[in-house]
Amino acid sequence: MNHKDYDHALWEKLKAKSLEEINENQPTIMGFDNFNEMIIASRTNINNVLPNNNCKITFKDFFDLEPPVENPMLILNPPYNVRIAQEKNHLFYEEIGSRLKHTWSGSDAWILSGDLESLKHIGLRPIRRIKLFNGPIETKLVHIPLYKGSKKDKYR
């Protein structure tokens, strides 16, 4: 900036062009929920942190959702004992596991849950488990690669 031939207008133009190119290369982040309150809260939080973002948050039930792109990364934060009664959680998590296995093969699934017992009912083996806290609630973030068939078939 203290260079003899410094051109401030050119510098600003280069910065703006660079920022445009960076934003064009950003992945699209899609969020879905079937509770309007969660959609509004998500949009508000995202816009507060990233005003010029590439996020699309819409109303849709996970069980009606098809992969929007080939081999996506899927991040789930299913309800844990807050929106669903405890006795129904195990069945709900089994349904999540079935949907992941049959609809999302080729994807990488990450699931954040505070219901550690129900998480076992997904029926798919995680390759990574990370202990986190969602506020005061102890949670696990598990990574489950999804593929067709069984793990034995994958490595034959």
Language model: regions and residue ranges:
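Conserved S-adenosyl-L-methionine
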Residues: 1-67, 82
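C-terminal catalytic and target-recognition region of SAM-dependent MTase-like enzymes
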Residues: 61-64, 68-156
